[in-house]
Amino acid sequence: MSPQTETKTSVGFKAGVKDYKLTYYTPDYETKATDILAAFRVTPQPGVPPEEAGAAVAAESSTGTWTTVWTDGLTSLDRYKGRCYHIERVFGEKDQYIAYVAYPLDLFEEGSVTNMFTSIVGNVFGFKALRALRLEDLRIPAAYTKTFQGPPHGIQVERDKLNKYGRPLLGCTIKPKLGLSAKNYGRAVYECLRGGLDFTKDDENVNSQPFMRWRDRFLFCAEAIYKSQAETGEIKGHYLNATAGTCEEMLRRAYFAKELGVPIIMHDYLTGGFTANTSLAHFCRENGLLLHIHRAMHAVIDRQKNHGIHFRVLAKALRLSGGDHIHAGTVVGKLEGEREITLGFVDLLRDNFVEKDRSRGIYFTQDWVSLPGVLPVASGGIHVWHMPALTDIFGDDSVLQFGGGTLGHPWGNAPGAVANRVALEACVQARNEGLDLAQDGNSIIRQASKWSPELAAACEVWKEIQFNFKSVDTLDLNEIK
């Protein structure tokens, strides 16, 4: 009889409740290369030892339940159970611990982020013995990574499709996000693309509302793309949001975008769901479409430091599920994002191999085994004065996306796009000539504005706009060197 089906008659069955740590806390366990490893921030209820709390997480997210069951004897728990193998105290926080859990790979369906998350971040997050629980990081083993398609195309293929190299890409979210007619929306797209942007974008909640149905928007945006391409000689795109109420409708919209010949579409991957997102990513690879991903709803999940899921985990999940771009914060704009933490998950999106680095919040070494990379998108409250910092922080393999920072230009949409393109080209040239963007950024922008009236006007409008608020999600004291 195989170990998987062996009946433990010699052990016998004893009903009742026993401590989780007797079965699921195994500090001597040596992790395997095929294990999925998780780092949980655990805040136990008063009186619950950290070992019991960590073991409870391992049990409730794998094979365990609240009482002993006789069917445990029909399988091999040692083969399938999750194990809490290490616990460390979080310095500077009262009664808070990092619990490390190892999961055997056989617990998870191949190629399914949905199944992986249903286990690891499922019912355990409502467990009464814990005051709070947060998933800080995951190590995805190479054996599991290879079961995913990942991004439809990846960074290098996108650059080849667009024929654009050596600089960040420029984008703009059309504003107001709701209320424009399809024709006026298309006009704004055309003006921004003609002015020098690479992309424009539907906002995350632009789907198919009474004021602008999706098919009309797609048609007017396609017209804007082709007209601006003819006038500028550059390849242009607009992120056509295919997110819909059903997967069937989502794919119908994606197919229509393909028929129009546009280069890129968009999906809200958290509100749309991982199953829908993975399906769309497969469609995009099969049909040559790039896929832009918006992270609407992420802050509900990731912003609180003691409960939820850290965005670095959501970013890893997106790379598995599939997307060529994803919003990743700005560090300098209006949205949450501490610099070292942001750079940590930006590397996890782009790079093929990332070493463990607790100073950037990275708990595990991650090998993506040639899974294509994802371009991080900096978006939210940014303008021309931020361009040097953004170019310095995110580097060439990124998308810098200015909504109000384009459409809020006093002379209109096209001049706003011109201002952003001039500022970017000036920063890239200065960097290539050896200047320090962090130190010389303002002088670079001022110098460029002398021969660009559009940039000069933008500099004047936004010279005093700042968002000086402390990040909620910060590094722990024991992570800061």
From Swiss-Prot:
- Residues binding Mg(2+) are 201, 203-204
Which compartments does it reside in? Plastid
**What's one Pfam family the UniProt record gives for this protein?**
RuBisCO_large
Binding of substrate occurs at 123, 173, 177, 295, 327, 379
Please name the GO terms of the biological process aspect recorded for this protein, alphabetically.
photorespiration; reductive pentose-phosphate cycle
- Chief location: plastid
Query: What reaction(s) does this enzyme catalyze?
Result: 2 (2R)-3-phosphoglycerate + 2 H(+) = D-ribulose 1,5-bisphosphate + CO2 + H2O; D-ribulose 1,5-bisphosphate + O2 = 2-phosphoglycolate + (2R)-3-phosphoglycerate + 2 H(+)
Does the keyword section mention Endoplasmic reticulum? no
- Locate the N6,N6,N6-trimethyllysine modifications and list their residues: 14
Which residue positions does N6-carboxylysine occur at?
201
Q: Which residues form the propeptide?
A: 1-2
Q: How is the cofactor bound?
A: Binds 1 Mg(2+) ion per subunit.
The job of this chain, per UniProt, is described as:
RuBisCO catalyzes two reactions: the carboxylation of D-ribulose 1,5-bisphosphate, the primary event in carbon dioxide fixation, as well as the oxidative fragmentation of the pentose substrate in the photorespiration process. Both reactions occur simultaneously and in competition at the same active site.
How this chain assembles, per its entry, is: Heterohexadecamer of 8 large chains and 8 small chains; disulfide-linked. The disulfide link is formed within the large subunit homodimers.
Quote the protein name from its UniProt record. Ribulose bisphosphate carboxylase large chain
